[in-house]
């Protein structure tokens, strides 16, 4: 896995302390795109997507504005959010989303928004203005160029800190052809002793 670019900033003035600023979100993501060059396209994007009535439409509008000119009905940007399936992980939400994205890129399979029953009408109206972004409710294969897949992840803090990261990952198929594996080096298997307590054994944790 390689981090191609990232940015963190404060979103500036908004309606209230917790209200997001869509223009700032858009500028943040566009700044990362400029860092990594415009010819690298995301296969998918892990949105912040908290399920709030105010925040989700603002984020959806910003994403649609960014990717409207870049995507089409045959190559839409696939959007998902871990929170739709597991709830909000608070301080760990950004890391959890990044891990989910890396696994999706590695396996070239998009995780569905399994608990999605109905879109916030304001999110729907934003995304339905174009076919640039879609919200899959079934697992699906990512559109990508072998041997790597690229994706982005957004994470927004309670008080206005916003972050976006773009990463590129070798697919499982490409790694198999290269004879590599995703198992850690033996010395790294005991680097996280506090995590091992959640598995019945160390081997089970890394399986």
Task: For each feature predicted by the language model, list its residue ranges.
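Condensing-enzyme catalytic core of the thiolase-fold
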Residues: 1-205
